[in-house]
Amino acid sequence: MTDSTYDVPRVRTYLQGLQTRIADALGALDGTPLATDVWQRGPEERLRGGGCTRILEGGRVFERAGIGFSDVAGDALPPSASAARPQLAGRGFEALGVSLVLHPRNPYCPTVHMNVRMLIATKPGEAPIFWFGGGMDLTPVYPFEDDARHFHQVCKDALDPFGAELYPRFKTWCDEYFFLKHRNETRGIGGIFFDDFSEPGFERSFEMMQSVGDAFLNAYLPIVERRAALPYGERERDFQAYRRGRYVEFNLVFDRGTLFGLQSGGRTESILMSMPPVANWRYNWQPEPGSPEARLSEFLVPRDWV
């Protein structure tokens, strides 16, 4: 969409505040404040700009929790950003967003991912093109139906004020996007995903993105609070590491955000903070039929949760 009325400083201020709010809440829950790593790229580099990474490793609740804010610009959109919109190939761009991945220590607590972002594509002599993207999705190891219903209900409640059609549309998009084709399974129980969103204009699109970002803590923290104290042993940790391998596979093979960052010359440490701290692979391993581990497969297909 072409529109010269967008307001990058307002978006930037919101995103920086969102990162701080989430980092403070996670630090309070874990009992360990998240460290702060501010970074900057020079004007001579392929990707210019900077950002702030909030990171916790080895915490009581979170084995790794990373929340990144970045505001970067480049001379040409990378292929991962223009593949679906070839008319944007070669345009300069600015991309700003917040992205997080949380890997809890307890296998009964699900991993979660959330991202909200804005991109502007520019070309001399033409009006800029902007769009919003983002979403959130839940990846349990030992799933609970109550958790899935709660997570999806909060996502739906965040979107409904902007149109009843958005939740089913973004929910389906999430199921299709977070799918491991080579494994024929979804990454988790889904959530919402959207990209190239600008139809209602800047103000309404920005409000919708804020609603998604603001909903995250309510979607996720009650689940962690319910599950973080459940007892577990070596068996559960082994299965958690095995399932984390699927997370690695998706992020390195399919994830457009990872590819965008690496293709555009982004900051590798920030891009790969989504990786789990421990993961493993086993040759042709299958869970015992009827076991809690086997039950996970029932959840790794698209389902209507609300």
UniProtKB/Swiss-Prot annotation:
Which processes are annotated in GO (biological process)?
protoporphyrinogen IX biosynthetic process
Q: Give the primary localization class.
A: cytoplasm
Major enzyme class? oxidoreductase
Q: What is its EC number?
A: 1.3.3.3
Entry's Gene Ontology molecular function annotations? coproporphyrinogen oxidase activity; metal ion binding; protein homodimerization activity
Active-site residues from the entry: H113
Gene3D superfamilies reported in the protein's UniProt record: Coproporphyrinogen III oxidase, aerobic
Question: Which InterPro entries has this protein been placed in?
Answer: Coprogen_oxidase_aer, Coprogen_oxidase_aer_sf, Coprogen_oxidase_CS
Compartment list: Cytoplasm
Purpose of the protein: Involved in the heme biosynthesis. Catalyzes the aerobic oxidative decarboxylation of propionate groups of rings A and B of coproporphyrinogen-III to yield the vinyl groups in protoporphyrinogen-IX.
* The protein's name in its UniProt record: Oxygen-dependent coproporphyrinogen-III oxidase
